[in-house]
């Protein structure tokens, strides 16, 4: 799954 850093936006 996608990394947590992908939700910084």
Swiss-Prot record:
Major location (coarse): secreted
Record GO cellular component, one term: extracellular region
Compartments, as annotated in UniProt: Secreted, Cell wall
Keyword Secreted: yes
UniProt keyword list: Cell wall, Secreted
The organism's place on the tree of life at top rank: Eukaryota
Protein name: 44 kDa cell wall protein
Species of the source: Nicotiana tabacum (Common tobacco)
